[in-house]
């Protein structure tokens, strides 16, 4: 099962949006996209960045934001036989894994930075994703990451 959400990050004088897709099996970030607009297209780009066959995915969970609950995402999920799961309205606890991942992402990698471009944010996000993935694997195999 996969979970996802969007968050915003200050870039220059604007807000940029980050969409992360997390594998619930091991909490690995397996998909991501960044952009200036909070849209279904941003979610689609994150889905397309997943490095393995979507036919292996059984469930896709998100909140009820219009960028997730729409025809474009419905068509993608249906094409791969993926079951949709939506949080109850007004209940962030239903998407707790995504919420806690974003909290850690912002505390560890965003709040101490000042981003001037989307490219800077993309580089930092990719480094954060690599670190988190490496850290998870290190914890599973009991050694520390050497980055």
Which positions does each model-derived feature cover?
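Charged DNA-binding/catalytic regions of mobile-element recombinases
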Residues: 1-147
């Amino acid at each position: 099962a996969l979970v996802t959400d969007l968050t915003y990050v200050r870039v220059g004088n604007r807000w940029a949006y980050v969409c992360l897709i997390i594998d619930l099996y091991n909490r690995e970030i397996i998909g991501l996209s960044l952009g200036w607009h909070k849209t279904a297209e941003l979610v689609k780009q994150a889905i397309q960045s997943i490095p393995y066959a979507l036919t292996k995915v059984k469930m896709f969970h998100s909140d009820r934001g219009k960028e997730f609950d729409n025809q474009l995402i419905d068509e993608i999920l249906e094409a791969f036989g993926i079951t949709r799961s939506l949080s109850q309205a007004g209940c962030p606890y239903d998407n707790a894994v995504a919420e806690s991942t974003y909290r850690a992402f912002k505390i560890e990698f965003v709040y101490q930075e000042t981003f001037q471009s989307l490219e800077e944010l993309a580089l930092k996000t990719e480094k954060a994703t690599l670190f988190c993935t490496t850290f998870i694997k290190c914890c599973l195999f009991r050694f520390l990451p050497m980055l």
